Amino acid sequence: MSAKPTAALVVVSAFIGLFAAGAAAAPALTELVSLRSNGKQGNGISGRVSAPAVSADGVVVAFDSEATNLVGGDTNGALDVFVRDRATGRTERVSVSSKGKQGNSGSSGPAVSGDGRFVAFSSGAINLVVGDTNGRNDIFVHDRLTGVTTRVSVAADGTQGDNNSIGTAAISGDGRFVAFTSDASNLVPQPASGRHIYVKDRLTGAIERVSVDSAGNPALGFVAASPAISGDGRLVAFASSASNLVADDTNGTTDVFVHDRVTGTTVRASVDSAGAQSNDVSFRPDLNGDGRFVVFDSAASNLVPGDTNGVPDVFVHDLLTGATERVSVDSAGGEANGQSVGPGIRGGSAFGARISGDGRLVAFDSIATNLVSGDTNTCGPFYNDIAGECPDVFVHDRLTGETVRVSVDSAGAQANDASTDPDISADGSTIGFFSAASNLVAGDTNTCPVFPNPGHCPDIFVHVR
């Protein structure tokens, strides 16, 4: 049985009512965002290795792209990170130095602050900041207001990491705190082998390891990954195969944990409503704004009663009450007939489900055909040509129980190819996602290597509810 949340965690997580009011109703709209400022479509895959990131109000969308025509002067031949401002229609490249110089290696894994000003990303480039001589992948933050790019995967005294810092980072609402995954052994004074999760305070320069138990001992083993951070930066969720982070961790598989940076307490979130541990792997967490609700993917069959579909599902654990619920269900609560998580575009996000700021809405993708009526779309041959088993993006409302499909065009017509890897704005209004479909917006005709059919070059879209 996992440890219960501390009183301090309960206090910081409590809010008035179980759910905040939902986002105001608005006409449904699906929009292509991986465009040049003049509206020209990209000539390469967007969302090549990472999910899009959406600001709190859904206006700013960050994404990676292989396209060379989204901005002028893109000649590095590498994956870059871009930001699209949906209000102004401007697209800019943010994986650049403080002088605007393009990176000399690939960049990916964007995360954005609540107001869209700060963008964290991962890069192998060595020319984004002065003194980058470690020859390793690092985590950077670009300030879109000042143009300044800083490296955050460094020790408190500025010493650069002795190994790679990788994957998609997580950034607090105000952009001050950045959580990231690193193999480096010299970011904090206490050495530890393997891969760990760290949090950098961009205001003070302090850095701490958070993949630790409640006594501060580091996770044992190689894997700690997929950080998520609460809006104020206090709580950090992550996945780890370590068995020493909480008492009685005997399931021998990867679990999801939450560390409270104020109290030092670490709890396991991938448990059932009675606190019993899962019987299979759990991974890819996300946190709502105050950190009360943890969404995660799991192949476990014992987290909720009646889980008999034999495929991975999406769950939400309430750190205040201890309740765990399955959210990859239809509007009547029926379980999915296909997996809702997976290793990639063939039926599951490589980056996991996402939860709105108030914890009410969860965005996820699934190959299930029974989550909504009329799910009969077929993917292109590159992905999956079985009718219905084409991954789509869904949103489940935990207050009303309703599940809707959002990887549709503005009139509600289903996509003609795969859609995966969602992010949802904190206000719940906007869902960003990756799609190879050509029919979500009019005039989607771009092509790229591997995807020669017009319009089926993967792009980043948003659906406004």
Where are these regions (language model features)?
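Bacterial N-terminal signal peptides that target proteins for export
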Residues: M1-V10
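Bacterial N-terminal signal peptides
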Residues: L9-F19
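Conserved "turn/edge" positions that cap or connect secondary-structure elements
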Residues: A25-R465
